[in-house]
Amino acid sequence: PAAPEPQAVENSVKLADNATFGKILTDSNGATLYFFSRDTQDTSVCLGGCLDVWPIFYAEDLSLDAGLDEMDFATIDRTDGSKQTTYKGWPLYYYASDAVAGDTNGDAFNNVWYVAKPDYSLMYARAQLIGHDGKNYLEDYSEGEGLTSYITDDHGNTLYIFINDTKDMNSYTNPDFSNNSVWPIAEIDLASIPSILEVGDFGSIEVYGRTQITYKGWPLYYFGQDSSRGDNKGVSFPAAGVWPIANVNTTLAP
């Protein structure tokens, strides 16, 4: 008798073409995977009842479609004792209300859940602002406890604006970049962005031969003393509100 046809083994993480979002990450069955804006540290804060709606994705034996880099994936030990696969530091989840492969019903849910894509240039985080001074800050830079949404790079590193800058004008960086280690310019090529953000709000400027990304006319920077993913210490340095985060509420640069 003829030998049975070998079954094609599907990779544990696949790259799917989605009509709305372009390239997205799915599991081996084509179920869409998601990022959670609140997972700014190397852990998951989706616990308890949250997991009923957003079940975790974990691949014990990771196999990837072409175009995905194994170095971008890792496994975390969750506080509930289970394991979860991460991509560029973001834990991966399913959305329980996605019924069939290709569904993306969870995107922009409460403005904190986004379809996982390999080509995001930026991400949208939501976390407590904790300044360089160790104090908790709210979005208006008064002291207090509460979550603020803000733009990060694809790995979750916080981006800032400088209140002394004007539209498409970096007033901070020295021509020889001697102070660039304090507030490094964000040199990011814009590809895909989370659906809450508008492509038209982004641009770029030339800064002494290098290219800096802008948002609503504001040049974007990193803070050199943010040493870990999820840090947002720049909000209080040298004083609260001099280097704010950027989010959809940010006003246009003057």
Place the predicted regions along the sequence by residue.
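Compact beta-sheet-dominated domain cores in extracellular/mature segments
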Residues: 2-254
